[in-house]
């Protein structure tokens, strides 16, 4: 150990960082958080649905308690990211694992910001964040704390990546709010239609706000990426798969937010369904480019990549939910 400290003192982590990493690995915070997030998010969702059918003081009190639990989980998530930042010595969004943790953090944070008066928003964002954390702990994602890759050793990591990856947070919130809105439309009947209409209208407004914030961040992040590309490779744009799909995502969400100006594409069902479908462009930009396509931003090696089975089930679920909710929307809402 003495020889390591004498000869490698420039790269050897300090004793405090070693102790911090031991604590970090022992706690295994993020692996635990996704279970707590999922449980609390699901329970809060059902409590809010029950409160729509019949308001009770006990339910409102319980819902308020769950909100504070989510605030606590968000604080723990933030503390975990800060601890990982301290241990690694770089911003915690430099690889696949860290970026998923960051997107989950941005999703809950946006849910808290937009869900001050909407329990559905808070519950939904917490649940979808738990799914992101669950994905981060699959066996194909490496959770180890590693040295920063030389190509990422730039101040732009703090700026470009933070903004563009952070934009996935509000866009994820928009997607899950679209799902919840269609679920509420599906559950609507003659007895609860008035309350359901209010909830769907509220969620649609918040959804539009979330998508607007996400689109602004995504656009700014793309321009910042061009600045970094110019410094690194001597050009602002090279039609790299990541750059191309980021541009496609911008165009897709710009269309979704302006659909109300197109005759025949107005209405809450159309907007909410479009917010779900549009998220496929983000999935392609993040997961698809990283693991399927070969480029400057990707991890793909040219080997065959097997698409997880749950992707096909998710696609089928979206189609079924869209069809049933459209039938209910035409029958009950018009």
What spans do the regions from the language model cover?
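Generic secondary-structure transition motif, activating predominantly at the C-termini of alpha-helices
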Residues: 1-8, 138-139, 152, 156
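Extracytoplasmic
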Residues: 1-44, 55-57
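Residue-level signal for secondary-structure boundary elements
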Residues: 4, 8-12, 174, 191, ...
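Juxtamembrane membrane-water interface segments that cap and precede transmembrane helices
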Residues: 13-28, 146-161, 300-305
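Hydrophobic cores of alpha-helical transmembrane segments in multi-pass integral membrane proteins
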Residues: 30-53, 63-90, 94-146, 159-186, ...
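Membrane-interface interhelical connector segments
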Residues: 187-200
């Amino acid at each position: 150990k003495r020889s390591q400290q004498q000869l490698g003192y420039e790269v050897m982590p300090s004793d405090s960082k070693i102790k911090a990493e031991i604590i970090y690995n022992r706690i295994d915070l993020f692996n635990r958080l996704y279970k707590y997030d999922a449980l609390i998010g699901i329970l809060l969702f059902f409590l809010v649905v029950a409160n729509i059918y019949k308001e009770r003081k006990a339910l409102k009190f319980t819902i308020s308690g769950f909100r504070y639990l989510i605030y606590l989980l968000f604080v723990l998530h933030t503390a975990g990211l800060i601890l990982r930042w301290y241990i690694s010595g770089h911003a915690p969004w430099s690889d696949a694992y860290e970026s998923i943790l960051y997107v989950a953090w941005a999703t809950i944070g946006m849910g808290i910001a937009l869900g001050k008066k909407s329990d559905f928003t808070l519950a939904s964002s917490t649940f979808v964040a738990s799914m992101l954390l669950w994905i981060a702990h699959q066996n194909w994602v490496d959770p180890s704390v590693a040295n920063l890759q030389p190509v990422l050793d730039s101040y732009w990591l703090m700026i470009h990546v933070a903004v563009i990856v952070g934009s996935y947070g509000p866009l994820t919130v928009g997607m899950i709010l679209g799902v919840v809105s269609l679920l509420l439309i599906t559950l609507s009947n003659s007895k609860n239609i008035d309350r359901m209409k209010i909830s769907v209208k509220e969620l649609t407004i918040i959804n539009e706000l979330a998508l607007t914030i996400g689109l602004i961040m995504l656009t700014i992040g793309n321009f910042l990426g061009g600045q970094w590309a110019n410094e690194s490779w001597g050009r602002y744009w090279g039609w790299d798969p990541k750059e191309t799909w980021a541009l496609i995502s911008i165009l897709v969400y710009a269309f979704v937010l302006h659909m109300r100006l197109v005759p025949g594409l107005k209405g809450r069902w159309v907007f909410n369904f479009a917010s779900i479908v549009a998220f496929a462009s983000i999935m392609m930009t993040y997961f698809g480019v990283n693991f399927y396509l070969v480029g400057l931003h990707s991890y793909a090696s040219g080997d065959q990549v097997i698409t997880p089975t749950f992707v096909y089930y998710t696609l089928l679920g979206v189609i079924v939910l869209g069809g049933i909710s459209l039938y209910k929307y035409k029958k009950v809402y018009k």
